[in-house]
Amino acid sequence: MPPRAPLLCFVLAGSLLSSGAIAADASAPPDDACALAARPLRAPDLQVPFDIVDGRIYLQVQVNGRGPFRFAVDTGASGIGRADTRLATALDLPLHGQATTSDGVSSASVQVVRIDSLALGAVVRRDVEVITRDYNAHNAPEAAFMGILGRGFFDDGLLVIDYPRRMLSFSRTQQLPTQGTNVLRYERAFRVPVRIGGEQVLGQLDTGANVRFVLPRAMYDTVSAGPLEAAGRSRLTNSQVEAQRATVQGPIEIGQLRLADVEVRVSAKYPELLIGAHALQQAVVLIDQRTRAVAICR
């Protein structure tokens, strides 16, 4: 089982869209990745509304033909998905060994269960093995979920997360180009180019993290001279880290998204820049793992 990237929980911290609801952007050049965000996908395999709680995406999933169950969509999670212990118990999911998971700071041994079918609308994954653990121990009741859809669930098509319209779409017949305007290529999922002021860095796109940004302390010192305030301990999947709070003047630019005067978390322990869900609420996020490309559109 591949390691799991952090699902951050900082403790101290719709209706269906009709096919004609988004007007096509006739001014966009043919190789502009954001042209796909400006018009409805042609005959998508999937188009479903989602809810947002504390920045995170929640939608309804069928497990072994039962449900629906509330799942989160987490691009920071490797593999097909995760099962909360409540789901594993309710469905009597069979144990299938153990795995090691990492949150970027520390590792832990976890149990694995087997699921016969995991279905989001017409998109179905069969005979999958997923990590199971208590994912809700530190969640508020309104943020509780029964499982997670990881990036592997969407690895054979184009995933479109339209935050303003709260709509998730998926297509195997359309794809992001490998180069062109607004194309963000990545080598390691999903580390994309980010510009902070005059600095060009890589940031991990993580829809499961209920923050705007997390910066390693060394990176923060190169992009801002602003003061830091204590923010207590921030909880990762396997561990906790001391965090501080600051405002980065920026601008912070990711694709078409441009943010200024952004509150961020800073930690000397965290290994890389993290782009969390709260930074993406005004964006349309497109991810195509077949072409290893991402687009962040407005």
What are these regions (language model features)?
Residues I22-R298:
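Pepsin/retropepsin-fold aspartyl endopeptidases
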Residues C9-S19:
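Bacterial N-terminal signal peptides
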Residues M1-F10:
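Bacterial N-terminal signal peptides that target proteins for export
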